[in-house]
Amino acid sequence: MLTPAFDLSQDPDFLTVAIRVPYARVSEFDVYFEGVDFKFYAKPYFLRLTLPGRIVENGNEQGSYDADKGIFTIRLPKETPGQHFEGLNMLTALLAPRKSRTAKPLVEEIGASEVSEGGVEDDDDEFDWEIEQSPYEEVPESALNPNCRYGFGNLRSGVFQRLQDELSDVIDIKDPDFTSAAERRQKRLAAELAKFDPDHYLADFMEDEAVKQVLEYNPWWSDLYSEMMTSLGKSQEEENLAALVSFSEEEKYQLRKFVNKSYLLDKKAHRQVYYSLIDILLAYCYETRVTEGERNVESAWNIRKLSPTLCWFETWTNVHEILVSFGRRVLCYPLYRHFKLVMKTYRDTIKILQLGKSAVLKCLLDIHKIFQENDPAYILNDLYISDYCVWIQKAKSKKLAALAEALKKASLTKAQLGLELEELEAAAFLVQEEEATSKAGVHSTSRQQTPSSSSETSGSEESEGSASLETEESDSEQEEPGGGESETGHSLLGPFVEESSMALLLNDGGMCRSTTFLGSDGGRGQPLASPGAPIAFGPLIQELGEQLETSVQISEPKDSAAGQQDSVLERESRQTPED
């Protein structure tokens, strides 16, 4: 038999059941309903529902069939007109559980309708979120269970004993079946400290344009929350919250595929289930916000990496430590690492919880789909998400509201994360101020030096111009005495420049004396007489003449140096006696 696609809706007097059976034989179908039971059969489809309210057969029931769409629509009158049926969109919970064909089990769950008034604690009572404390007692090693438990409600164990190699990429903990909860937490904290990168954090902190864009994004629950606050200013009724959240056909198909079952959880395990739900929702809200609702290949990694419940099998004792752990992991692992993003995700999770279990279920279905399409993250569906999708449909709305209030009262600061964020930010601001101060000083200095440098440039240009003018005048004076002497001087100038070396000597008074060594064969090494060269420097000049490769070069403008050499050579040529 096939379970058909179905949908339930209601008005004050009727419950409407729409059943899609495209391949059914329309001429043969049966409908049965009485009290909270509803059954439909049209070969090869069979549907059995346990309704949240009672219906009655009084002659006002109606039925129709749309041949084009293949949909049966059945309207059933309510036993109590005006009564609101809760949880009509929780399709898995509506599917009646399978009855055992064996003997009656030794442990049996008692339904709420069968509970005596004084025997069992009322599930609607206010939930106490404070963990019960007991005196510390030393536990002997022989009493410890080596098979540490994990999964939904800590009901699973032994899963990783044979699949450690295949599933090592899913979780961060090694040998979870032999690692206690305390050891898991110790290793997790050490891994987070080793992974924290101050440079990455400061880069996102100082240059937060991308983070601002992520913070401005409005996910699907933001509009629903605004609508809820507008329409439910006075009271928050379950029927109004359920009407805000709708499920797609794909999500309804997911719900029909889940196996309806019950969970026997003690008080401690029950609390762990709620706490882990917060942790998983925080990771999901972060992923939805940073990707702006567009899933990618990193979505599964982000969710399981940011949730210690999923990657470290962490257990919790209060809401605050969940926030601290989530904040640390956001600043250590994903692409965007900013504390404002942590707080924004925290507020998103509160909104989802306040929207009710329909919104929570929608988030869990999305996580289930992401993990199902990722290898090997699908194992986390078997350990956690599938059970959460079934369990949340039967969870009490009052407890979710109480959980939202407990989360809303919690607070988180940077100092509580234990990563020295405030010290890093203070150091970054100090460096930024120093850089700004140094840049301002360099800018003011350059502005002061600009006029002086321009004046120096103009002064050097004037000196070069005067030097060239003096050289021209000296050349004109030397050309006046006679053509023979000038020709002799110029004939010696060519080889003299090519094969001579100039040594500039400074005397005590700072005067620059020049001695020129003639490069001809007859007079090699003999200094030409210079009018201003003192006689005491004769031996020194002779020694310098023998070592031509040693010279002191003083950089000066080419024009002035050339003019100086020409003037010296011409003066010496005039002093040389004619043959």
Swiss-Prot record:
Its main location: cytoplasm. It is found in: Cytoplasm, Cytosol; Nucleus, Nucleoplasm. Residues 1-89 form the CS domain. Residues 438-492, 550-579 are annotated as: Disordered. Residues 444-458 have a biased composition (Low complexity). One of its GO terms (cellular component) is nucleoplasm. GO terms for molecular function: unfolded protein binding. GO terms for biological process: box H/ACA snoRNP assembly; protein-RNA complex assembly. Residues 568-579 have a biased composition (Basic and acidic residues). Residues 459-482 have a biased composition (Acidic residues). SUPFAM superfamilies: HSP20-like chaperones. InterPro entries: CS_dom, HSP20-like_chaperone, Shq1, SHQ1-like_CS, Shq1_C. Keywords: Cytoplasm, Nucleus. Directly interacts with DKC1 alone, but not in the context of the core trimer composed of DKC1, NOP10 and NHP2, nor in the presence of NAF1. Does not interact with NAF1. Belongs to the SHQ1 family. Required for the quantitative accumulation of H/ACA ribonucleoproteins (RNPs), including telomerase, probably through the stabilization of DKC1, from the time of its synthesis until its association with NOP10, NHP2, and NAF1 at the nascent H/ACA RNA. This is Protein SHQ1 homolog. The lineage of its organism: Eukaryota, Metazoa, Chordata, Craniata, Vertebrata.
